[in-house]
């Protein structure tokens, strides 16, 4: 999109993933209906932006820099930019500008106030990224329970689910309040995303010296092999799927339209991490799906 090209992160932040097309493909799995075009664009931009933030924590910086970056995002004030090193200034300004754009866009329908909920989720995930970065830099390995309590947020699904409602005119403040309580279906979805991601990315993270991974934490806590830990995480994914389906079928205070976004976010995980491979980080795995959906015509 023009927005992504204008940011030019490919040049200014060469460590970051360039995944604009993959981000939009992801959102097509969340809502394919034409009336959700605004929602798709907002969600795609957020996925692209959180990838930049995630890659910043993964690939760059020292604890002190991450601490200042995290604090600046909690304060959410452009005046904080002067505290940051140059490479962090780029993503910080882009992040604040993006949410300003959301507020301006939603103000046309009198809904700018709901952007607050998405901002709070962004602040939350950044706090949790900071914890993970400290673990990595300091060589700390948490217990698997401590790991998961932090890693559910860094799955991105608290943030992305909240963001998925921004462009839906039917999503009211009450829906955002409900989501902010972390209902069971959201917890299950975040768990699903987390453990499936951990299985798919284990070898890559191990190769770059990451010891505080879910699989490694489970292996140490229970004295088991990699294969057993992977099987346990797969079992956790299956339980999470059952919880998602159960919550979809039972009476809830929100409509099917609202719940379907959560269900579809779960479904797209199956595509992204098909055969335990990370299709987002390695887009060649995604390419056949993208071509089939957005390029090839349907034969009649």
From Swiss-Prot:
<dbReference type="InterPro" id="IPR008949">
    <property type="entry name" value="Isoprenoid_synthase_dom_sf"/>
</dbReference>
<dbReference type="GO" id="GO:0016114">
    <property type="term" value="P:terpenoid biosynthetic process"/>
</dbReference>
<dbReference type="InterPro" id="IPR050148">
    <property type="entry name" value="Terpene_synthase-like"/>
</dbReference>
<feature type="binding site">
    <location>
        <position position="197"/>
    </location>
    <ligand>
        <name>Mg(2+) 3</name>
    </ligand>
</feature>
<dbReference type="Pfam" id="PF03936">
    <property type="entry name" value="Terpene_synth_C"/>
</dbReference>
<comment type="function">
    <text>Sesquiterpene synthase that catalyzes the formation of vetispiradiene from trans,trans-farnesyl diphosphate. The initial internal cyclization produces the monocyclic intermediate germacrene A.</text>
</comment>
<keyword id="KW-0456">Lyase</keyword>
<feature type="binding site">
    <location>
        <position position="54"/>
    </location>
    <ligand>
        <name>Mg(2+) 2</name>
    </ligand>
</feature>
<dbReference type="InterPro" id="IPR034741">
    <property type="entry name" value="Terpene_cyclase-like_1_C"/>
</dbReference>
<comment type="pathway">
    <text>Secondary metabolite biosynthesis; terpenoid biosynthesis.</text>
</comment>
<keyword id="KW-0479">Metal-binding</keyword>
<dbReference type="GO" id="GO:0005737">
    <property type="term" value="C:cytoplasm"/>
</dbReference>
<feature type="short sequence motif" description="DDXXD motif">
    <location>
        <begin position="54"/>
        <end position="58"/>
    </location>
</feature>
<feature type="binding site">
    <location>
        <position position="54"/>
    </location>
    <ligand>
        <name>Mg(2+) 1</name>
    </ligand>
</feature>
<feature type="binding site">
    <location>
        <position position="58"/>
    </location>
    <ligand>
        <name>Mg(2+) 1</name>
    </ligand>
</feature>
<keyword id="KW-0460">Magnesium</keyword>
<keyword id="KW-0963">Cytoplasm</keyword>
<protein>
    <recommendedName>
        <fullName>Vetispiradiene synthase 2</fullName>
        <ecNumber>4.2.3.21</ecNumber>
    </recommendedName>
</protein>
<feature type="binding site">
    <location>
        <position position="58"/>
    </location>
    <ligand>
        <name>Mg(2+) 2</name>
    </ligand>
</feature>
<comment type="similarity">
    <text>Belongs to the terpene synthase family. Tpsa subfamily.</text>
</comment>
<feature type="binding site">
    <location>
        <position position="201"/>
    </location>
    <ligand>
        <name>Mg(2+) 3</name>
    </ligand>
</feature>
<dbReference type="GO" id="GO:0000287">
    <property type="term" value="F:magnesium ion binding"/>
</dbReference>
<dbReference type="InterPro" id="IPR005630">
    <property type="entry name" value="Terpene_synthase_metal-bd"/>
</dbReference>
<feature type="binding site">
    <location>
        <position position="205"/>
    </location>
    <ligand>
        <name>Mg(2+) 3</name>
    </ligand>
</feature>
<dbReference type="GO" id="GO:0034003">
    <property type="term" value="F:vetispiradiene synthase activity"/>
</dbReference>
């Amino acid at each position: 999109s023009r927005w992504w090209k204008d940011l030019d992160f490919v040049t200014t932040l060469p460590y970051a993933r360039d995944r604009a097309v993959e981000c939009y493909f992801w959102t097509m799995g969340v809502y394919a209906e034409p009336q959700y075009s605004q929602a798709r664009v907002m969600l795609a931009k957020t996925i692209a932006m959180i990838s930049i933030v995630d890659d910043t924590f993964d690939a760059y910086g020292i604890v002190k820099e991450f601490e200042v970056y995290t604090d600046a995002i909690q304060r959410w004030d452009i005046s904080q930019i002067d505290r940051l090193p140059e490479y962090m200034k780029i993503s910080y300004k882009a992040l604040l500008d993006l949410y300003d754009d959301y507020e301006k866009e939603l103000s046309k329908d009198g809904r700018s106030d709901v952007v607050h909920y998405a901002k709070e989720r962004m602040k939350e995930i950044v706090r949790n990224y900071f914890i993970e970065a400290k673990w990595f830099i300091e060589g700390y390995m948490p217990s698997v329970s401590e790991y998961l309590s932090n890693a559910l947020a860094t799955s991105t699904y608290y943030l992305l689910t909240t963001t998925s409602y921004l462009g839906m005119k039917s999503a009211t403040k009450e829906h955002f309040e409900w989501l902010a309580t972390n209902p069971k279906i959201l917890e299950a979805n975040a768990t699903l995303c987390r453990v499936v991601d951990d299985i798919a990315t284990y070898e890559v993270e191990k190769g770059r010296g990451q010891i505080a991974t879910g699989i490694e934490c489970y292996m140490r806590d229970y004295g088991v092999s990699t294969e057993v830990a992977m099987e346990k995480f797969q079992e956790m994914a299956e339980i999470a799927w059952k919880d998602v389906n159960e919550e979809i079928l039972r009476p809830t205070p929100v409509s099917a339209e609202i719940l379907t976004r959560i269900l579809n976010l779960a479904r797209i995980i199956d595509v992204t991490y098909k055969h335990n491979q990370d299709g987002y980080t390695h887009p060649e795995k995604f390419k056949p799906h993208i071509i089939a959906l957005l390029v090839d015509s349907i034969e009649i």
